């Protein structure tokens, strides 16, 4: 069991349960899940500590459950090589099925100067949801842990000095009307010399060809790490996010949009006091093309070990609950 500090009160945590015990499973953290409900099984891909033969910061692990209560032991499905100052991480997964393949979009990073990095978006794919996942390369091949992964999306502006900001990443991808839609974070266009977090929306019919532009910014500002699904019952896009993340007043909220560009103000699903403290990086269950699970959807998020009442950076379990529970 994860080492615990003082636990949060039952009123804040009774609706939530552990999906991944990072400490027991041999790594330091678990967060930012991409969740697909397929044929009665939850498939959860999440960001976790890198390891093995590769010195990358992060790796993507995978766990499953048929009841939302008992979960398989997580296994690594995607690693980065950190070769030549590139491909520094495999994090923030977003999985979608398109034209016969499961495409696993993920955030990596590259070195722009000494101890200076920016996030970028890359992709791997598989014919089966449980892998193996092969990464798209600069040679336009698909290979296992290549040293030359192809960067699909760079930050709008590259920075070779501090502050460099986060870069581009934290993507959320769905399929709508035969097209791939992506929302992602980019803070590289500075305001008054400082990074400003914006969310951008892109569309493509080619999984490895995207065209970022500053004109594709949504009305979301300072709303990093979102997860978007399509709500068939309302014929609208739905966004889920932990507001006030990494704080004692964190809460779960959602927004709606008819076009994916203009979003309503976030409304609390679980307000502060009814949601775990210091939570962050949520993902909500949907089908394999990104329609939100109905009538009740599993939502996962990172939180301090065992719901500890402390901001223990980098020591996170993956917890979950249900939006619109029966």
Which ranges hold each PLM region?
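Beta-rich carbohydrate-recognition and catalytic domains
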Residues: 1-88, 96-166, 174-224, 230-278, ...
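Polysaccharide-binding and catalytic clefts of secreted carbohydrate-active enzymes
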Residues: 171
């Amino acid at each position: 069991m994860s080492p615990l500090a003082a636990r949060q009160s039952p009123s804040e945590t009774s609706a939530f349960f552990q999906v991944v015990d990072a400490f027991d499973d041999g790594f330091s953290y678990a967060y930012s899940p991409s969740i697909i409900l397929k044929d009665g099984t939850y498939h959860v891909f999440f960001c976790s500590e890198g390891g093995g033969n590769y010195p990358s910061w992060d790796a993507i692990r995978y766990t499953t459950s048929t009841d939302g209560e008992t979960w398989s032991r997580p296994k690594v499905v995607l690693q980065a090589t950190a070769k030549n100052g590139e491909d520094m991480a495999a994090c923030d997964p977003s999985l979608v099925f398109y034209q016969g393949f499961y495409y696993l979009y993920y955030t990596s990073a590259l070195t722009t100067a000494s101890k200076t990095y920016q996030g970028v978006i890359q992709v791997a794919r598989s014919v089966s949801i449980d892998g193996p996942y092969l990464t798209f390369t600069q040679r336009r091949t698909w290979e296992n842990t290549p040293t030359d992964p192809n960067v699909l999306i760079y930050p709008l502006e590259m920075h070779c000095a501090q502050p460099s900001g986060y870069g581009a990443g934290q993507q959320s991808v769905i399929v709508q009307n035969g097209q791939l839609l992506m929302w992602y974070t980019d803070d590289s266009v500075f305001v008054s010399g400082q990074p400003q977090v914006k969310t951008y929306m892109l569309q493509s019919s080619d999984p490895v060809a995207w065209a970022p532009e500053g004109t594709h910014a949504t009305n979301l500002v300072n709303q990093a790490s979102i997860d978007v699904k399509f709500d068939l019952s309302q014929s609208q896009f739905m966004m889920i996010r932990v507001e006030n993340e990494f704080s004692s007043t964190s809460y779960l909220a959602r927004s709606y949009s008819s076009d994916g560009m203009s979003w309503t103000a976030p409304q609390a699903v679980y307000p502060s006091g009814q949601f775990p403290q210091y939570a962050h990086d949520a993902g909500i269950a949907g089908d394999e093309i990104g329609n939100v699970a109905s009538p009740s959807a599993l939502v996962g998020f990172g939180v301090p070990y065992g719901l500890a009442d402390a901001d223990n950076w980098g020591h996170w379990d993956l917890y979950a609950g249900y939006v619109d529970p029966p």
